[in-house]
Amino acid sequence: MIRNPRLRNREQANNRHLIDPYPVHTLKRVDQPTTRINEAEVFRQHEQTSGFYRAGRGDFGEHMQQEYRRFVPKYPLSGAMVSMAGALADLVDEPVGMGAAGMPDSAVPKNMSWAPMGQVAEKKAPFTDNPEKMARHIKETAYFLRADLVGICELPVYAIYSHQKQDGKPIHLNHKYAIAILIDQDWHTSRQTSGNDWISNSMSFLAYSTSGFIACMLADYIRRLGYPARAHHAMNYQVAVPPILLWAGLGEMCRIGDIVLNPFLGPRFKAAIVTTDLPLAIDKPIDFGLQDFCAKCKKCATECPSGSISDKDKVMYHGYEKWPVDVDKCTKMRIGNKQGSGCGVCIKVCPWNKPNTLFHRSISWTMRKLPFARRFGVWGDDLLGYGKPDYNHKWWLDLETINGDLQVPNSSKNR
Ligand code: SF4
């Protein structure tokens, strides 16, 4: 088993022209995402319509409003991660009126010689006008910063939120390109968890905070090359992530509602985005047979503890043809979970949630290429016991902060 998800595979090591850690060059590329999108019907969403925002506002009652404030920090590790992610909230774009190292202009010493932090450089850097070379360079830079997968697309206008969550102000974003950065939530931990125990939120925030950290640095780097760029991460989005992932060739929409599923990571990742005007060659959407696979599998719908995921057919919703999901039920489950912190059972049980080993890459290839094998794939997944927690290797501590005290919860699997 490859424990380090960042280890590049042997194929890449032997082919220096391959820059991606996963064999994305083997995927079938298509002109349109496999999810039908009726662009005339897609409207730009107000970010305050999200389930979590509504919970924090009190739309689901006082108890949920209180739980919303503690459902991540009630577990000490996810609390540490959300603090770090929060520190990145104001580092997404060039600071207004700030100088070097984030100091106010008035406080910057006159003899300071380096470029002010985060500003778009006045002169464009040499060698930045070739879109093919720059796309390759930006991907290599993101991988150097420890991204797991990267894709690039033109930014669809309908992916831009209409209004900000923080202050409700209208969003004016006119960047041409979007760079999507995926971070794996860790297979080693995913194998052990039930999906809704005490490590669940930490897996999410590992990927939220890391992808946000990389996006903020990448956006700052691009601004230093002389082009506008803004990072978008869990603590400060101006764009909806799923349509960008579809167009950037990083996955297909799956049965788990608005979730995009990647052929190498499954749904076990979180993403951050950089939008920019730096000229970049774009990727194309991918088709690995997921629409057919999800139509047959339905494992997430069966296992979802809140019954939020439908086992029925797709419907047209806000211009997307997708499987419906009950966002309110899902939000209440994740916030109100008394047996753990958060919930990701759908991610845990998905047959595409596998390690990057030769055996699993072979199975994945078969599922992608041979439609008749897909039913056997779901059956074999159950037979081999994937989807069940493996607490024999559990590494984390079960703890819950209650009224300021750390306690061992009744649901603890500590051994
Ligand atoms: Fe699709 Fe099955 Fe994964 Fe659900 S569990 S997203 S139906 S492949």
Locations of regions flagged by a protein language model:
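Low-complexity, intrinsically disordered regions enriched in charged/polar residues
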Residues: 75, 82, 244, 360, ...
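Non-catalytic, usually N-terminal nucleic-acid engagement modules in DNA/RNA processing proteins
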Residues: 1-190, 195-197
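Intrinsic-disorder/low-complexity, polar/charged segments
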Residues: 130, 134, 209, 213-214, ...
